[in-house]
Amino acid sequence: LDILDTFKLEKNLYEELEDMIYAEDSDYFLEDLIEQVLEHTEMPRFRLGSIEPGELSERLLKTYANPRMCPHFHMSIQSACSKTLKGMKRKYDAKLVEKSLKDIQRLVPNAYVGMDVIVGFPGETEEDFNETFQRLASLPWTRIHVFPYSDRPGTKSEEYCEKVDTVEKKRRASLLRELSSQRLREQALAQIGSLKDCILLSKYKDKSKVQVLSRDYWQMQLINLPEDFDLERIAEGEFKVKVVSFDESNASRMDGKLLAELVES
């Protein structure tokens, strides 16, 4: 299947199976869908989008034993404080957040785990924020996407009275982003020297700007490509790169170097 076929399949699966899987009386689960797609298609890569802790079953994690499942998770946790999660009307608590992250580490070791976290939700006290911060600091993950809370018209939280001051929201966001940057740097440095299967993200005439994406969601810039290298040779399918350095001027990027022997194959 080419990329277009993959997008069509994804769209059709979503439209046809969404109601069947998420209906209250449904006997079907996300795990059923993934297992069926893995069994009945030959698509080489599958990556799940945003997922909540309550959806992360052991059965789902065991599907990652299949090499076609990309070891990358985007966790929509929002907070790691049970009181704050209750205020957000989430169907899980901090214990389940903790369990889900530990389960990923246990069953899909070395996976890239990104998370969405909101700071300054109405009613979030300093103690609540510190609980989230300390809990996350002790858990396994790769990166946090931090969002200061803002009112959205028509939502229940818009009516809440205990709003957090804008300056305080920015302070909390800054602290979490610093924690995230430190963790991302540690994880990135641990990748140096490893070989990764990648796909091409962009094609530039300037060979110093070529971006690739690994199965475990590390975005890298290829370096030392010859000026006469034809990118069409790697435009379809996967190829290997060797991670050689981490550019600390941009914490979201790593530098990779193609393995010459694989490029020539």
What does each model-found stretch correspond to?
Residues 159-265:
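Terminal RNA-binding accessory module
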Residues 63-69, 91-94, 132-133, 201-213:
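Short, charged low-complexity intrinsically disordered segments located at boundaries
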Residues 33, 59-60, 130-134, 182-185, ...:
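Glycine-rich, charged/polar anion/phosphate-binding loops
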Residues 44-49, 71, 111, 142-145, ...:
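Structural beta-strand/beta-sheet cores of well-ordered domains, especially the beta-sheet scaffolds
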Residues 1-126:
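Conserved SAM/AdoMet-binding glycine-rich loop
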Residues 51, 144, 223-225:
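Thr-Gly-centered strand-to-loop micro-motif
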Residues 49-51, 76-78, 116-118, 147-149, ...:
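Generic beta-strand/beta-sheet core signal
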